[in-house]
Structures are given as C-alpha cells and as structure tokens.
C-alpha cells in the first residue's frame, strides 16, 4: 500500500518543474556524455564512461522518485483557511514565542517540502502538530522537544 505524500500546490509545481528539467535537459545531457565517453574506445578502463554510467543511474533514479512523488501526491487546498480561520497545511502562521518573546513566521508544508532554514515547517513537526486546527489568539504549548515552550498565534494567511 503506497502512502500519500502531502504537498502544497507550490510543492507539486516544483516537483513537476524538476521532472521536466530532468527529462528535457539533464537526461539528454547525460546521454550525450555517455555517448562521448563510449567513443573514447576501450570501455574496460574508461573512467569517463564509468562516471557517465553512474550519473545516468542517478538521474534515472531521481526521475523515478519524482514521478512516484507526483503520482502519490495529495495536494492540500488551503484556499479555505481564511474562511475557517484555522491553521492548516499550507497556512503561513505568525506567532509570538515565549522563549525569546519575538514574533516569528512559518509556513506549514508536507514533510518532503520542509526546509527549516526557509521557515517551511513539516506538518509532522512538534510545532505544526501543536498549532494545526488552532485559531488567531490561541496559545499552545510546544511539547515533545527538549525544552517545551508556548506560542500565541498572531495571524494566519
């Protein structure tokens, strides 16, 4: 049984763009490198040929992986976030942290889209689990971490 992959619409579009690039740019380039390396003669001691074959295997594996992700994707429609006023996957949430008393902003995304350095937080993270379904003004405790703390939701976009 294959597990659904939760994605925002933006995440799905990024995967489609990556797949298109792999199929239309990267794969043909690798095939060209493979042909050039093969034309160098003896394949038994041809490092360029071996490298090109390895690169081809990597590209083909990534194509298959991205196709699988796209096929298993469950795209989250967050267009109703504003009407319900609740935090959902795809929501951008501004909150006040009790740790440093600073306002911060994060976007909740599916696990494969997560990038904490870009403030894209996995729906499986402790903070996302704590605020999903909550509303502006709610204060929640972030648990399952070394030092629990509280946050107050200031806005939801």
UniProtKB/Swiss-Prot annotation:
<keyword id="KW-0238">DNA-binding</keyword>
<dbReference type="InterPro" id="IPR001437">
    <property type="entry name" value="Tscrpt_elong_fac_GreA/B_C"/>
</dbReference>
<dbReference type="InterPro" id="IPR018151">
    <property type="entry name" value="TF_GreA/GreB_CS"/>
</dbReference>
<dbReference type="Pfam" id="PF01272">
    <property type="entry name" value="GreA_GreB"/>
</dbReference>
<dbReference type="InterPro" id="IPR036953">
    <property type="entry name" value="GreA/GreB_C_sf"/>
</dbReference>
<keyword id="KW-0175">Coiled coil</keyword>
<dbReference type="InterPro" id="IPR036805">
    <property type="entry name" value="Tscrpt_elong_fac_GreA/B_N_sf"/>
</dbReference>
<keyword id="KW-0805">Transcription regulation</keyword>
<dbReference type="Pfam" id="PF03449">
    <property type="entry name" value="GreA_GreB_N"/>
</dbReference>
<dbReference type="InterPro" id="IPR023459">
    <property type="entry name" value="Tscrpt_elong_fac_GreA/B_fam"/>
</dbReference>
<dbReference type="GO" id="GO:0032784">
    <property type="term" value="P:regulation of DNA-templated transcription elongation"/>
</dbReference>
<protein>
    <recommendedName>
        <fullName>Transcription elongation factor GreA</fullName>
    </recommendedName>
</protein>
<dbReference type="InterPro" id="IPR022691">
    <property type="entry name" value="Tscrpt_elong_fac_GreA/B_N"/>
</dbReference>
<keyword id="KW-0804">Transcription</keyword>
<feature type="coiled-coil region">
    <location>
        <begin position="1"/>
        <end position="75"/>
    </location>
</feature>
<dbReference type="InterPro" id="IPR028624">
    <property type="entry name" value="Tscrpt_elong_fac_GreA/B"/>
</dbReference>
<comment type="similarity">
    <text>Belongs to the GreA/GreB family.</text>
</comment>
<dbReference type="GO" id="GO:0006354">
    <property type="term" value="P:DNA-templated transcription elongation"/>
</dbReference>
<dbReference type="GO" id="GO:0003677">
    <property type="term" value="F:DNA binding"/>
</dbReference>
<dbReference type="InterPro" id="IPR006359">
    <property type="entry name" value="Tscrpt_elong_fac_GreA"/>
</dbReference>
<dbReference type="GO" id="GO:0070063">
    <property type="term" value="F:RNA polymerase binding"/>
</dbReference>
<comment type="function">
    <text>Necessary for efficient RNA polymerase transcription elongation past template-encoded arresting sites. The arresting sites in DNA have the property of trapping a certain fraction of elongating RNA polymerases that pass through, resulting in locked ternary complexes. Cleavage of the nascent transcript by cleavage factors such as GreA or GreB allows the resumption of elongation from the new 3'terminus. GreA releases sequences of 2 to 3 nucleotides.</text>
</comment>
């Amino acid at each position: 049984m294959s597990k659904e992959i939760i994605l925002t619409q933006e995440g799905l579009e990024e995967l489609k763009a990556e797949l298109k690039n792999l199929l239309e740019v990267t794969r043909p380039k690798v095939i060209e490198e493979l042909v050039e390396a093969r034309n160098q003669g003896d394949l038994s001691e041809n490092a360029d040929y071996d490298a090109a074959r390895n690169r081809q295997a990597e590209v083909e594996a990534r194509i298959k992986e991205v196709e699988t992700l796209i096929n298993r994707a469950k795209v989250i429609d967050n267009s109703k976030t504003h009407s319900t006023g609740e935090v959902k996957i795809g929501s951008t949430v501004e909150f006040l942290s009790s740790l440093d008393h600073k306002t911060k902003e994060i976007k909740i995304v599916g696990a494969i889209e997560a990038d904490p350095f870009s403030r894209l937080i996995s729906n499986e993270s402790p903070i996302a689990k704590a605020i999903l379904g909550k509303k502006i003004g709610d204060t929640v405790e972030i648990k399952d971490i070394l030092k629990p703390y509280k946050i107050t939701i200031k806005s939801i976009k």
